[in-house]
Design a protein with these regions (language model features):
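Active-site neighborhood of phospho(di)ester-bond hydrolases with catalytic His/Asp-centered motifs
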Residues: 11-13, 36-44, 63-66, 127, ...
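Active-site HxH/HxHxD metal-binding segment of metal-dependent hydrolases
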Residues: 25-113, 133
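Loop/turn elements at helix/coil->beta-strand transitions in domains of secreted/extracellular proteins
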Residues: 6-7, 33-36, 58-60, 119-122, ...
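Conserved beta-strand hairpin/beta-sheet module of binuclear metal-dependent hydrolase folds
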Residues: 1-26, 136-150
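Core dinuclear metal-dependent hydrolase active-site scaffold
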Residues: 107-141
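PEST-like low-complexity, intrinsically disordered acidic/proline/serine-rich tracts
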Residues: 70-71, 124, 158
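Solvent-exposed loop/turn segments at secondary-structure junctions
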Residues: 8, 15-18, 43-48, 68-71, ...
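Cap/insert and terminal regions of metallo-dependent hydrolase folds
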Residues: 14, 18-20, 155-180
Length: 180
C-alpha cells in the first residue's frame, strides 16, 4: 500500500471482496485519504478477485500491464474457477465475489508513473516474464521500496503453473539491477 499526500494506491486486491474489506479497514486506521488506484501485479485470482470492493470504496483506476489484461481476457474466468476449486482456504467468504470479472480500467506497456499527490510518485514497470507473462512491480525509487508481486517469494515455494522458467532468472536479475 502506498499512501501519498492526496491519495492511496493498493497493490493487489486480495482473493475476495470480503478480504479486501479487511485491508480497507486497516487503511482507514492509518489514513482517510481516498483509495484512488489499485494495481494488479499479475492476473491470478488470489490477487484480483477483491477488486470490486475498491470500486465500491471509490477507486478511480484499476491498473494492469497489457499482458496481464490479455491474460485476464484469455484465462480469467478459467483461473477464477480453478483457483477457487483448488485452493478454497485462500478464498475466505468466496460468496462475496461477484459474478464475472472486475476489469482493469487502465493498461500500460513497459513503464508508467502515478502521482499520489504532489509529493509521492509510484513508478510501475513490467520487468519481464517470470511468475506470469504480465508480472508488474511498483516502487518508490528514492526510498528503495518495491512491491514485486509473486516474482519474489519469501519462505515459500513459488507457484509455477503459468511461469516462464527460462525467463524468470533474467527477470530477477533485471529486478536486482534496480538496487532495492
Amino acid at each position: 500500500i502506498f499512501i501519498g499526500d492526496e491519495a492511496v494506491m493498493v497493490v493487489d486486491t486480495q482473493a475476495t471482496p470480503a478480504m479486501a474489506q479487511d485491508v480497507i479497514r486497516r487503511i482507514r486506521e492509518v489514513t482517510p485519504l481516498p483509495i484512488k488506484y489499485v494495481l494488479l501485479s499479475h492476473y491470478h485470482a488470489v490477487r484480483v478477485l477483491g477488486a470490486s470492493a475498491y470500486f465500491k470504496e471509490g477507486a478511480e483506476q484499476i491498473i494492469a500491464s497489457r499482458d496481464t489484461y490479455d491474460l485476464i481476457v484469455e484465462r480469467g474466468e478459467q483461473d477464477k474457477a480453478s483457483e477457487i476449486g483448488r485452493f478454497p482456504r485462500l478464498f475466505r467468504n468466496v460468496e462475496s465475489v461477484p459474478p464475472g470479472l472486475t476489469w482493469p480500467t487502465m493498461t500500460f506497456d513497459g513503464t508508467m508513473s502515478v502521482w499520489l499527490g504532489k509529493k509521492l510518485e509510484v513508478k510501475i514497470a513490467q520487468v519481464g516474464r517470470g511468475h506470469t507473462k504480465g508480472d508488474t512491480i511498483a516502487y518508490l525509487e528514492d526510498q528503495k521500496i518495491c512491491f514485486a508481486g509473486d516474482l519474489v517469494e519469501y519462505q515459500s515455494t513459488a507457484y509455477a503453473g503459468d511461469c516462464y522458467f527460462r525467463d524468470w532468472p533474467t527477470t530477477l536479475d533485471r529486478l536486482a539491477g534496480f538496487g532495492f
